């Protein structure tokens, strides 16, 4: 497997230089684009990696999967009264659909949906970001994980669009807490710094019927795990979810920091990272690497 990952690394390296790092978050604009890492963590506890798999990066929207998992653990089916389960087809930070649909976001992985989930967690925990950080540390088996406050502060400074979504949802009665407090927690979560190995380990529970062998916890039930993977397959890659399903055929979630996680149910979790993004905000080399991996191993949730 490690030989395969090294060959994939060499295959996608020519793509580096053809994308663009996220520049709408100033603290992310300075990331060296000439980087690539990939890691796999199997249900047997085996770790394989290649490239810069131990280089930390900002997980950004990948954090939405952690937030959703916490909300499911504490709210169960009741949470779906406030957020939908349908693909959006619009950019991840769109306001148009949100107003048209009376302040109920299409799914938990667009920004509006993630803000509602953060609002729920704000109601549940006295210190939401602390609860999230400790949860992620357990899943990754890494007690040293933290947020990058420079990135979090940068995102908060340029919060206008996210704040607009939150206030719009509040106007429709779908936001309970102080908007600025929720935004701080939301950006702190997005600014968590992790690497490919951390993330592959963290999401191993989604490949293992909800059980994390690293923390020894049943994180979600087997049924809830299937449901989360279904949402990842339909809505995990912004408005490129269909293309990802076509090319890769696995549940996945991306972030504008250049990371993408993907799940091979009952087998392993994988994280790939390369900072340059395509026009949809997904890692250019990362998408190609996961497509090459899927082709090589012949595993897809679609048969």
Curated annotation (Swiss-Prot):
From the Swiss-Prot or TrEMBL record, give the protein name.
Glutaminase
What NCBIfam families does its record include?
A: Gln_ase, PRK00971.1-1, PRK00971.1-2
Where is coiled-coil annotated?
none
Asked if Translocase is a keyword of the record, the answer is no
The alphabetical list of record keywords is: Hydrolase
InterPro entries, per the entry: Beta-lactam/transpept-like, Glutaminase
Residue positions annotated to bind substrate are: 61, 111, 155, 162, 186, 238, 256
Question: What quaternary structure, including any partners, is listed in this protein's UniProt entry?
Answer: Homotetramer.
Source species, domain of life: Bacteria
**Which Pfam families does the protein's record reference?**
Glutaminase (PF04960)
Class of enzymatic activity (EC top level)? hydrolase
Family statement = Belongs to the glutaminase family.
Gene from which the chain derives: glsA
